[in-house]
């Protein structure tokens, strides 16, 4: 069984086809401008001596502070997907006996300040998360990907040509 990563849960909320393709090792993201920008943001933080990425099990957490697990994103284009990604990370930490709150920092390209969202793994969110994880497992175990549904964000996706051309 595939271990569900932060990327997979993010893709599940963003696009079921993308989630299935990524989980089944059809990776076209090396050609994605957005993926490159995200990697550069992490590299810049590393160069400034702020290397804070932490690996726990099969997930990579951007940063942990005294009170928060922090996830950094370049834009707030899909905050719901990021929320569930952070809830997964909080759940993984809880399984290790570490209780934190989630903090999502969106670094907007053309704005002076960053947007910050907060999330907590309460009983309701944890129950929903476990249901989502079961649904993701069902999805990625399908023999073929679900049919792609065109959305506005598809044009910027690394899988656009695979799905629509």
Which residues does each predicted region cover?
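Short, charged low-complexity intrinsically disordered segments located at boundaries
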Residues: 39-43, 50-52, 118-124, 158-165
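Short, flexible, glycine/charge-rich loop motifs used to bind or transfer phosphoryl groups or to couple energy/partner
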Residues: 53, 60, 92, 144-147
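Broad gene-expression machinery/nucleic-acid interaction feature
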Residues: 60, 101, 154
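Metal-dependent nuclease catalytic cores that hydrolyze phosphodiester bonds in DNA/RNA
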Residues: 1-69, 73-80, 84-87
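Short helix-capping/linker segments at secondary-structure and domain boundaries
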Residues: 20-28, 93-100, 165
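Nucleic-acid nuclease catalytic cores
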Residues: 56, 64-140, 161
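Cysteine-cluster motifs in flexible loop/terminal segments that predominantly coordinate metals
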Residues: 15-19, 143-165
């Amino acid at each position: 069984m595939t271990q569900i990563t932060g990327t997979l849960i993010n893709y599940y909320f963003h696009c079921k086809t993308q989630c299935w393709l990524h989980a089944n090792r059809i990776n076209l993201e090396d050609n994605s401008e957005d993926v490159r920008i995200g990697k550069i943001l992490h590299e810049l933080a590393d160069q400034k001596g702020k290397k804070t990425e932490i690996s726990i099990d099969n997930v990579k957490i951007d940063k942990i502070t005294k009170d928060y697990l922090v996830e950094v994103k370049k834009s707030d284009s899909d905050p719901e997907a990021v929320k569930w990604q952070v809830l997964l990370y909080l759940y993984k930490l809880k399984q290790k006996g570490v209780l934190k709150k989630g903090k999502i920092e969106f670094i907007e390209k053309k704005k002076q300040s960053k947007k910050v969202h907060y999330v907590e793994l309460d009983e309701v969110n944890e129950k929903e998360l476990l249901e989502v994880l079961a649904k993701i497992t069902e999805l990625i175990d399908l023999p073929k990907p679900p049919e792609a549904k065109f959305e506005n964000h598809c044009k910027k996706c690394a899988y656009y040509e695979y799905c629509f051309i």
